[in-house]
């Protein structure tokens, strides 16, 4: 469970409320609806979010910028100890976008500042060819401060998010309980390719394993 400093007691109170509520809500769609209803209050709390980002700049212990994340612009704000949900902050430079990727859980995205663009895709192939994926763009949405959007797990949630404008934008995301998969798929729609993206620690272990295999070390 993420420990927040006393100076962010207001944020801790939000997460405590979310935890108590989600423990009582069993259905995925109901949890998504609850999260979408709750998020604007946090997204529009500029004073609190400025405090969080100021603490990042000052090198405070929270948020812990040393914590391993899938993307370099990702900051972990909270992970529930029962994995009911996690909360993450993303900061996008002008023109910066994530790779096209899927997710291992449902999620709700929200815009904190400027504009966030979310591009959704549908997978068109039958998934029988390793490394091959044919995608079709299904829609684009533009989020402004306080707006939210939903992403669903696996093929139902293939998307990319980013900053279409000048100036740095900030996005807040809440993710539900993940399925037991150690990677996410990342896609290259122009080349019809798909590959697995692993968390940094696991990615390093896999690289070391591959190196040992190349060196003839088989029994690990």
Q: Language-model features: where?
A:
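A short glycine-rich, His/Asp/Glu-containing loop-to-beta-strand
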Residues: 68-94
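Asparagine-centered strand-capping/turn motif at beta-strand->loop junctions
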Residues: 160-165
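Short acidic-glycine-tyrosine-enriched beta hairpin
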Residues: 122-158, 197-201
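N-terminal leader/capping segments at the start of a protein or of a new domain
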Residues: 1-57
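Conserved short histidine dyad/triad with adjacent acidic residue
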Residues: 88-102, 152-156
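A short hydrophobic beta-strand segment most commonly corresponding to one strand
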Residues: 108-110, 166-181
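Long hydrophobic alpha-helical segments typical of transmembrane helices together
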Residues: 187-220
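Glycine- and acidic-residue-biased ligand/ion/polar-headgroup-sensing regions
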Residues: 105-124
């Amino acid at each position: 469970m993420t420990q927040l400093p006393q100076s962010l007691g207001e944020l801790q109170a939000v997460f405590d409320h979310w935890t108590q509520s989600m423990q009582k809500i069993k259905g995925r769609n109901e949890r998504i609806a609850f999260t979408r209803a709750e998020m604007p209050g946090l997204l529009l709390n500029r004073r609190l979010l400025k405090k969080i980002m100021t603490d990042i700049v000052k090198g405070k212990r929270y948020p812990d910028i040393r914590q391993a994340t899938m993307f370099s612009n990702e900051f972990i704000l909270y992970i529930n100890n029962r994995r009911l949900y996690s909360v993450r902050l993303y900061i996008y430079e002008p023109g910066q976008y994530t790779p096209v990727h899927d997710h291992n859980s449902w999620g709700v995205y929200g815009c904190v500042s400027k504009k966030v663009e979310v591009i959704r895709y549908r997978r068109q192939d039958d998934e029988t060819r390793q490394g091959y994926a044919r995608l079709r763009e299904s829609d684009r949405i533009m989020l402004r401060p306080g707006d939210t959007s939903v992403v669903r797990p696996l093929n139902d949630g293939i998307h990319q998010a980013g900053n279409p404008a000048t100036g740095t934008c900030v996005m807040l995301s809440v993710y539900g309980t993940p399925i037991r998969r150690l990677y996410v798929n990342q896609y290259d729609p122009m080349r019809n390719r798909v590959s697995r993206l692993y968390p940094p620690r696991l990615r390093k272990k896999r690289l070391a394993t591959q190196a040992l295999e190349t060196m003839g070390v088989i029994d690990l």
